């Protein structure tokens, strides 16, 4: 097969310039932190967060670079606490909305049809928010996503334990999508929402 692959890659590392352009403006003045500034740059901390989200590993299993003394340059708990703080402040949602806004501004979104579907991700080594899916025969996390026709994710994932029915998750996902659409000025007039057959029945 020749030519470039059509699928999209998941970013696992940002350059400092990319971080300052796309992420830093959404972290807020002071980043919601009291006390001395972190010894490790926010850029490097953010890249560690991207890495653990991509790998799907436990935080304590995150590979961390060594400093000049041969010690980990940061403890994994500090990365985790930073991530949770940014979540609580709404920074992660703001970063996501900013990326969707950029896709819209660059005319890279096709909102004629919005696709919604769910999947179960395996978590063989444990983790948070897990449940056993009898249908999939695995223990993991249930995820529902909404995408445009180019497979751009245009609403934050809604997750639950793997044994949960997907229908209630869609009920939670649609308001979050509507919130982002209003925030960035999406024009959804005439848009068709296409859902997996599991959503045809009543919410259960």
Where are these regions (language model features)?
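Short alpha-helical elements
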Residues: 1-204
């Amino acid at each position: 097969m020749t030519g470039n692959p059509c699928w999209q890659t998941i970013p696992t590392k940002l350059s400092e310039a990319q971080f300052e352009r796309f992420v830093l403006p959404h972290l807020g003045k002071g980043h919601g932190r009291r006390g001395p500034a972190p010894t490790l740059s926010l850029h490097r901390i953010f890249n560690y967060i991207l890495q653990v989200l991509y790998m799907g590993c436990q935080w304590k299993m995150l590979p961390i670079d060594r400093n000049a003394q041969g010690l980990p340059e940061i403890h994994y708990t500090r990365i985790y606490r930073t991530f949770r703080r940014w979540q609580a402040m709404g920074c992660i949602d703001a970063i996501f909305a900013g990326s969707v806004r950029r896709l819209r501004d660059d005319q890279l979104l096709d909102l004629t049809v919005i696709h919604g579907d769910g999947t179960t991700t395996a978590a063989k080594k444990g983790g948070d928010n897990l449940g056993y899916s009898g249908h999939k025969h695995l223990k993991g996390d249930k995820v529902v996503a909404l995408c445009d026709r180019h497979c751009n994710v245009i609403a934050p994932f809604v997750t639950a334990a793997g044994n949960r029915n997907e229908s209630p998750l869609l009920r939670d996902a649609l308001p979050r999508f509507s919130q982002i659409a209003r925030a960035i000025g999406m024009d959804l007039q005439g848009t068709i929402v296409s859902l997996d057959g599991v959503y045809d029945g009543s919410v259960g």
